[in-house]
């Protein structure tokens, strides 16, 4: 498929540095630099312009429910993804619809990373009304059509198959979150522990 040229992946995410507020954002922020050491990576995110990614404002349709505005950003992402990509990889319901549409539009596989699931957040129905119905629909539709789903744990894999029992279990793979050992490693210094009153 790629001969001697690097694979080209478009990562679709709502969160990307410097705007990160949850685990999926941390995951993508750690994943992309590692992927870029191996392959070519395009990043499409939501929000304000930033270095290393193409950002899409969540402002259309103006004044609409947040889910509709996320879909507006999704459509903008699909249009901005380079024609040369070999695969699209979406994270969370915010970009799962973009991944589905981009896969169809560019005729490439769509892979989803499962961080959380809308069916496991029923309280959002009361908070978001129709927006929750839309986010749930987008997630289910994207999962049903995805070429592969990556669960970040065995527990998440079980949750995906429980929430979406029609999925082929062979399409749902576990790839645990990695750890950057340059950043996270054992230390022998105890100054910080003492400074906060903790017995090292």
Explain the meaning of each model-derived region.
Residues 1-51:
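N-terminal subdomain of nucleotide-sugar transferases
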Residues 50-81, 126-127:
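A short, charged, and often flexible helix/loop element on the N-terminal side
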Residues 90-95, 114:
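Short His-centered aromatic/hydrophobic patch
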Residues 108-111, 119-141:
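Nucleotide-sugar donor phosphate/pyrophosphate-binding loop at the beta->alpha transition
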Residues 155, 178:
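Carbohydrate-associated surface elements
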């Amino acid at each position: 498929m790629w001969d001697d040229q690097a694979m080209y992946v478009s990562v679709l995410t709502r969160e990307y540095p410097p705007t990160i507020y949850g685990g999926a954002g941390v995951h993508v922020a750690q994943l992309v630099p590692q992927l870029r050491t191996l392959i070519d990576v395009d990043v499409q995110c939501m929000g304000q312009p930033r270095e290393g990614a193409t950002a899409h404002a969540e402002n259309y349709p103006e004044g609409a429910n947040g889910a509709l505005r996320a879909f507006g950003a999704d459509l903008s992402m699909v249009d901005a993804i380079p024609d040369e990509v070999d695969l699209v990889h979406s994270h969370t319901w915010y970009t799962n619809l973009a991944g589905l549409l981009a896969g169809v539009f560019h005729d490439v596989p769509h892979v989803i990373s499962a961080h959380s699931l809308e069916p496991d957040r029923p309280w959002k129905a009361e908070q978001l009304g129709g927006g929750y119905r839309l986010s749930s629909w987008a997630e289910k539709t994207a999962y049903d059509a995805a070429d592969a789903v990556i669960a970040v744990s065995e527990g998440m894999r079980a949750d995906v198959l429980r929430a979406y029992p029609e999925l082929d279990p062979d399409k749902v793979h576990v790839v645990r979150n990695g750890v950057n050992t340059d950043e996270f490693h054992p230390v022998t210094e105890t100054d910080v522990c003492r400074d906060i009153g903790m017995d090292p």
